[in-house]
Amino acid sequence: MGRSLKKGPFIADSLLRKVEKQNAADDKSVIKTWSRASTILPMMIGHTIAVHNGKTHVPVFVTEQMVGHKLGEFAPTRTFKGHIKDKKGGR
């Protein structure tokens, strides 16, 4: 179930201020954030946002196709190492 249209998309206030500040200054430096739940807005296109995955900040370059998605979708938190093969021969 999605968020109500009456409320609008969620975006952290600090992240929104940083993006607006960079847009006004025409600056495209990396923005570091821990807000994985923030929705990507059209004003973020072209910015590189470093999203925290629990260990490090993963740089995410925002494109037009990402608008409407959450930042956390593009910074995976788990690494799959693969299933262990059974040893042949046994005892």
From Swiss-Prot:
Quote the function comment for this protein: Protein S19 forms a complex with S13 that binds strongly to the 16S ribosomal RNA.
Q: Which organism is it from?
A: Synechococcus sp. (strain WH7803)
One Pfam family recorded for the sequence: Ribosomal_S19
Q: Which residues cross the membrane?
A: none
Gene behind the chain: rpsS
**Which domain of life does the UniProt lineage start with?**
Bacteria
Q: Is Ribonucleoprotein set as a keyword in this record?
A: yes
Membership in a protein family: Belongs to the universal ribosomal protein uS19 family.
Which InterPro entries does this entry report, sorted A to Z? Answer: Ribosomal_uS19, Ribosomal_uS19_bac-type, Ribosomal_uS19_CS, Ribosomal_uS19_SF
Gene3D superfamilies annotated for this entry?
A: 30s Ribosomal Protein S19, Chain A
GO biological process: any one?
A: ribosomal small subunit assembly
UniProt xrefs under NCBIfam families:
rpsS_bact (TIGR01050)
Q: What Gene Ontology molecular-function terms does this entry list?
A: rRNA binding; structural constituent of ribosome
Q: Reply yes or no: does the keyword Ribosomal protein apply.
A: yes
* Name this protein carries in UniProt: Small ribosomal subunit protein uS19
Q: Which residues form the signal peptide?
A: none
